[in-house]
């Protein structure tokens, strides 16, 4: 709430119960500036977004271990998700995201107790090994992914695909698309 806001006579209020309020400062009809913008504050906004700055769909899940962006997780452990420590895990679930385009279950916990788990879309993943754009990734243990051979891939263990070539063997955050087999 902006405590410095003062009613200059051009303020328009809606629903005194507090469901929404619109503020508008004065200015000419053709004047575009910060002073003429409308600031809407609401309890619930029903709107349609036509674009997003980021490219993954994520949801908050309770975790039983410390995780960070790019970590591969699986369902299970003592909470909902845990870091995936198995190679070629059929329980692989998603990747910890730091900037999802859309976040579901947003009010559940915080990033330590309920990290944002990317379920689909473009996200940076901790990948070890070299690979070409389009190569499939699977869990590689220690919360990392690795490049899979075609004979290793199944519907259950494939996490996604590399978007760009990866030229070094070291584990690095690598742009991938997940949820694509």
Name the predicted role of every residue range.
Residues 29, 37-181:
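Extracellular receptor-binding modules and their adjoining Ser/Thr/Gly/Asp/Asn-rich linkers
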Residues 1-56:
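Small/polar residue-rich beta-strand/coil "junction" motifs that cap repeat-based extracellular fibers
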């Amino acid at each position: 709430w902006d405590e410095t806001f003062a009613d200059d006579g051009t303020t328009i209020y809606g629903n005194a119960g507090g469901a929404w309020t619109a503020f508008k400062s004065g200015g000419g009809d053709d004047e575009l500036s910060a002073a003429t913008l409308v600031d809407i504050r609401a309890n619930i906004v029903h709107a349609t977004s036509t674009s997003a700055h980021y490219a993954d769909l994520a949801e908050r899940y309770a975790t039983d271990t410390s995780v960070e962006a790019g970590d591969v997780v699986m369902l299970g452990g003592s909470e909902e998700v845990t870091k995936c420590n198995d190679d070629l895990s059929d329980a692989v679930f998603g990747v910890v995201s730091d900037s999802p385009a859309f976040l579901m279950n947003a009010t559940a916990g915080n990033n330590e107790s309920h990290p944002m788990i990317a379920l689909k879309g473009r996200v940076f993943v901790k990948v070890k090994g070299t690979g070409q754009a389009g190569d499939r990734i699977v869990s590689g243990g220690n919360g990392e992914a690795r490049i899979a051979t075609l004979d290793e891939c199944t519907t259950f263990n494939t996490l996604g695909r590399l978007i760009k070539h990866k030229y070094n063997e070291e584990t690095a955050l690598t742009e991938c698309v997940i949820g694509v087999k």
